[in-house]
């Protein structure tokens, strides 16, 4: 049985699994799917197109499946797919896809720290840590087991290989191969 605060709004067309906790001032839009055993603390926004798995904890101020910040987006129906066992911290924003790929994907067992952003059509793998205030532009791929420290800026269309570790404050505009420790100055 779901525990939904009387101060939360859940659209009648939203599909909820079992044993979810939805805190006060949460908003769950139509055309959304929420699996089982998720915890939405207060003031979480789940916009249309969200497909959220099981056992995720989503903290205050997070906004998932937001309208893409892409001028080519014309309102087409797209998706933001989030897997299982993720910790999505305060004020994280994740955009849904555009016509380019149609879906933004976040895998399983990730820690997305506060105030970070994942843009449209990104593919974020599993077992990834993304630090505070990191910004990932559109259509970026982050392979499994990568660590992006705080305040990393990632240009669109880049690929970050598996097991990469990126130092805080770094910015880059090209792919980073797997098993690399990268950092500080602009990566070329």
What is the role of each PLM region?
Residues 185-188:
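Conserved beta-strand-loop-alpha-helix hinge in the C-terminal portion
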Residues 3-183:
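Structural signal for interior beta-strand "rungs" in well-ordered beta-sheet cores
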